[in-house]
Amino acid sequence: MSEGRVRASWGALFFVWSLLAVFRAPTYHLWLFALVATEWGHWLAAPALLTFAPGWRRTRGGSAGAVLGLAAAVLFLSPVARAAREFGLAWSGPAPLVLPRLWLGAHVPAVREESLVYARACGDELRLQLYRPMVAAGRLPVVLVVHGGSWQSGSRLEMPELSRELAGLGYAVASIDYGLAPRNVFPGPVDDLRDAAAFLRARAGDLSLDMGRVVLLGRSAGGQIVLAAAAASDPIPGVRGVVDFYGPNDMRLAWTIPGSPWILDSRRLLSQYIGGAPAEYPERYDEASALLRAGPKFPPTLMIHGGRDELVWPVHELRLSARLAALGVPHEYLELPWATHGCDYAFNGPCGQITTFEVERFLGRVLGGAPPFAATYPDRSV
């Protein structure tokens, strides 16, 4: 293959990939490439520009490759540009988005980490990963983290960076495993979350935990679980706030208007998680839907969603935000226009930085040690 064709092919490859930084992915596997394009695109811009290596003007193929590479670099950098326009861009923190951190990363403090068995489900041990600061003065407020995975997969060990970051700030973070569908159907995972909280409450003395100051944090399926737990008629004691990363909160809506099966077979997943269709288990669908169950005593809530999420529609958070506003419940809805599902997987990417900043501020407000709930920068309180 000639040099011109190599340049043209290289530029075309990166240009097609970069389109996923601005357009929705049509399939599940392309969503994975979209996640990389939107949250690691600033890393991909440089190899895209290799088409401008000396000699690019010698052939038509080289010139075409250079143009495509330049266009790809611009699109790969667009998520950072959009994030900076929305949240500002700083050279050092604390700030929502710090430019050097995109490439250099952030210092994550050393913390104490241990694995504890808190219960058994379906004959299996259920463990939690407990993160605590190396040195603690007094009892620590607790963040209970519930992983995603369509209720059928995932692990407490996923995405540990935020847990370590929060532990370094003086929180105890317990990331839990829970029984997975289809063996463990709703409300099984919510009951597992309760068991984890009860276990920590029983061990609060020797683990130096303040179980009167608890925040529930869930991602995707875990977001649904923590919202359902908070909306239950018998909520977990001591919960002062909920953080929901891109979780569904209206299971009837998720069934009635499913997403593209090329992306996610949501009806199959719901049927395996709830135990069947809404016509078979109407009460379970209602109990699993925080939108339908939330009342005036629902805890303060931070909802985070990517504006172009292909797996869980942002309308879930918009409707819950309106519901909480009608109930007078303090809440905040943070929508990231460029971001897709799982955007915080890149801890140092634009989504990871901004959401970490917002989560830390939210925890300070609801657990103490920070200004009242009203947001200060930018104002997203509803």
Predicted regions located by residue number:
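C-terminal catalytic histidine-bearing segment of alpha/beta-hydrolase fold enzymes
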Residues: E3-R5, G11, S18, R24-T27, ...
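N-terminal cap/lid segment of alpha/beta-hydrolase-fold proteins
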Residues: A21-A46, L89-G138
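Hydrolase active-site cap/lid region
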Residues: A83-H107, L227-E283, A346
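Short beta-strand element of the alpha/beta-hydrolase
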Residues: G138-G149
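Short amphipathic alpha-helix adjacent to the substrate-entry channel of hydrolases
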Residues: L157-A174
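Alpha/beta-hydrolase active-site loop
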Residues: V185-G205, T355
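Gly/Ser-rich "nucleophile elbow"/oxyanion-hole loop immediately N-terminal to the catalytic nucleophile
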Residues: R201-L216
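Short beta-strand/loop motif that positions the catalytic acidic residue
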Residues: K297, M303-H305, D309
